[in-house]
Amino acid sequence: MIQIGKIFAGRYRIVKQIGRGGMADVYLAKDLILDGEEVAVKVLRTNYQTDPIAVARFQREARAMADLDHPHIVRITDIGEEDGQQYLAMEYVAGLDLKRYIKEHYPLSNEEAVRIMRQILLAMRLAHTRGIVHRDLKPQNILLTPDGTAKVTDFGIAVAFAETSLTQTNSMLGSVHYLSPEQARGSKATVQSDIYAMGIIFYEMLTGHIPYDGDSAVTIALQHFQNPLPSVIAENSSVPQALENVIIKATAKKLTNRYRSVSEMYVDLSSSLSYNRRNESKLIFDETSKADTKTLPKVSQSTLTSIPKVQAQTEHKSIKNPSQAVTEETYQPQAPKKHRFKMRYLILLASLVLVAASLIWILSRSPATIAIPDVAGQTVAEAKATLKKANFEIGEEKTEASEKVEEGRIIRTDPGAGTGRKEGTKINLVVSSGKQSFQISNYVGRKSSDVIAELKEKKVPDNLIKIEEEESNESEAGTVLKQSLPEGTTYDLSKATQIVLTVAKKATTIQLGNYIGRNSTEVISELKQKKVPENLIKIEEEESSESEPGTIMKQSPGAGTTYDVSKPTQIVLTVAKKVTSVAMPSYIGSSLEFTKNNLIQIVGIKEANIEVVEVTTAPAGSVEGMVVEQSPRAGEKVDLNKTRVKISIYKPKTTSATP
């Protein structure tokens, strides 16, 4: 155990322990040489540091991994020894291993399972071309990054544990579920052994569980080369036959029926979901041939001698003549060969009978291995009664949607019906939660959180509910604006159909319109609706005789400007107001009628504020009735409501006739 916070090997600051394998501990560390980059440091456990076989295997496999530079293989960055401790540093993959991912998301959609398996195959193709067989492929040794990239790790390093401690049977349970039939018989692992393991992993991705299980490694290993592979389609009806055929061929028990290389499997897998293979027949192999069978080793002498001896009964004839009696040391002539052969045969036969009897006695002392009854279609109560009657215990109850099985009835058992298990084994029940489809409602205008909760209640997986945000000034943040599947659509839970909800979010930018000529009250209301703060809308009034009061004459910023409502930018609107003062026109030389009409109708002076006076003196050339003076004078400001205008009209004096 390395102390947390310690600087290991002069460059790795240990942050925490993140894993513990069969022979090594794994720590998250920061590489001080690479500016604190996070790495995973695997250290051979103390009790293996003195084992030359374990150390040699650890080093050999670490170097082999270091040669595998591939985007789908965990990269080795450093190999070394520190204070007698063998270690290797590798890239840190922040994500889940495939085992946990399957547990949380099973069954995976066909497309996702194919995508992940293609990545694993690409990684193993490189390894196999370099002469490296993994020997321990399982979901726990496949890591998934947050973006869904698969990375294979632990290239056979854990095999050193099996080599140096063969008696640790329980430690093999993690891998025996993916063990090829030839490995179970004791043969050497090959490229096709890795292919078999990938077939089992593929089965698990599409069904959510392993095909073979049991109480011991031996029981599971026997199933790998004795029991046919359970149907994938029976477990997951959405899987097409062409895709199941890939698994059937990858897990064929005879090597001659199995894919010869990962490239061959990759090509077949790549077209398994294509339209051209939609009517493919189920692949069936004759697995009865014994060509791949390996002869089991003979029973050792120590085993035979452990069988209790039985004293043979012999017939003693009376000796008529005592002198003819002989002692043990007395020489006796050998019996004829034929007689000796018969005696040996009888002794061998008796020994075999004793061995058989001993085995029967031993087996009778152990719990019987019996087939799990088929309880599919039964109610939970009926299934429990049937299993208890067969001397099985009841395990967990899980629910699963089903179009075929009525709600509350059994879909299947785990392990499956017909599988051999010992009495007392716990059998899990998979119970139908009802049909796999429902009608899509109208979600527009509703809160997205309520819609998501409703979809989850209807068993739609989280990864199939996609939220896309869109800025909106009209709708409250979090409100559903659009939905990808229209109201009334029948949604099939068995298919990985994505539901896309477009949800409103607070808009931060708007496009300013052309507000000139519009009423200022309407424009201010519109800007407020678009979340423009009221204190940033400035109104400036300007007198205008051409525009109706309240009408916008100018704006800043101009029309079409992108305005960020999160920034304190002021919008200035120049609004027309009624004219209250004007410059006094010049009316000198005009007639009284014209002057009054112009002042009232054009300038806006009230008639009551116009005073007309007559004067008798005027500039030369003036005619009667002409304006000769005005007050205010031309150009002076006139308040239309207050100023009195005085107009002087020339009226010459009349001269009386002299008598």
Swiss-Prot record:
The record gives the membrane topology as: Single-pass membrane protein
Positions of the PASTA domain: 366-433, 434-505, 506-577, 578-651
Q: List UniProt keywords, sorted A-Z.
A: ATP-binding, Cell cycle, Cell division, Cell membrane, Cell shape, Competence, Kinase, Membrane, Nucleotide-binding, Phosphoprotein, Repeat, Septation, Serine/threonine-protein kinase, Transcription, Transcription regulation, Transferase, Transmembrane, Transmembrane helix
Q: What molecular function terms (GO) are annotated for this protein?
A: ATP binding; protein serine kinase activity; protein serine/threonine kinase activity
Per the UniProt topology annotation, the Cytoplasmic ranges are 1-342
Mapped to this chain, the residue ranges on the Periplasmic side of the membrane are 364-659
Query: What regulation of activity is recorded for this protein?
Result: StkP is activated continuously during growth and its activity is inhibited upon growth arrest. Inhibited by staurosporine, a known protein kinase inhibitor.
Location of the active site: 136 (proton acceptor)
Q: Which residues cross the membrane?
A: 343-363
What the entry lists under SUPFAM superfamilies is as follows: Protein kinase-like (PK-like) (SSF56112)
Task: Give the UniProt subcellular location, in the record's own words.
Answer: Cell membrane
What EC identifiers does the entry list? 2.7.11.1
- Spell out the activity-pH relationship: Active over the wide range of pH from 3 to 9.
For this record, the Gene Ontology CC terms, alphabetical, are: plasma membrane
Q: Which residues bind ATP?
A: 18-26, 42
Q: Which Pfam families match?
A: PASTA, Pkinase
EC top class, as a word: transferase
Q: What is its main location?
A: membrane
Task: Spell out the InterPro entries in the cross-references.
Answer: Kinase-like_dom_sf (IPR011009), PASTA_dom (IPR005543), Prot_kinase_dom (IPR000719), Protein_kinase_ATP_BS (IPR017441), Ser/Thr_kinase_AS (IPR008271)
GO terms, biological process: division septum assembly; establishment of competence for transformation; regulation of cell division; regulation of cell shape
Q: Which family does it belong to?
A: Belongs to the protein kinase superfamily. Ser/Thr protein kinase family.
Task: Give a short account of what the protein does.
Answer: Protein kinase involved in signal transduction pathways that regulate various cellular processes. Likely senses intracellular peptidoglycan subunits present in the cell division septa of actively growing cells; thus, intracellular unlinked peptidoglycan may serve as the signal molecules that trigger StkP phosphorylation activity on a set of substrates. Plays a crucial role in the regulation of cell shape and cell division of S.pneumoniae through control of at least DivIVA activity.
* Domain remarks in the Swiss-Prot or TrEMBL record: Consists of an N-terminal kinase domain, a transmembrane domain, and a C-terminal domain containing four repeats of the PASTA signature sequence (Penicillin-binding protein and Ser/Thr protein kinase associated domain). The C-terminal domain binds to synthetic and native peptidoglycan (PGN) subunits and to beta-lactam antibiotics, which mimic the terminal portions of the PGN stem peptide. Deletion of both the transmembrane domain and the PASTA domain negatively affects the stability of the core kinase domain.
The subunit field of the Swiss-Prot or TrEMBL record says:
Homodimer. StkP forms dimers through its transmembrane and extracellular domains. Dimer formation likely promotes autophosphorylation activity and might be necessary for targeting StkP substrate. Interacts with PhpP via its kinase domain.
- What this protein is called in its record is Serine/threonine-protein kinase StkP
Species name: Streptococcus pneumoniae
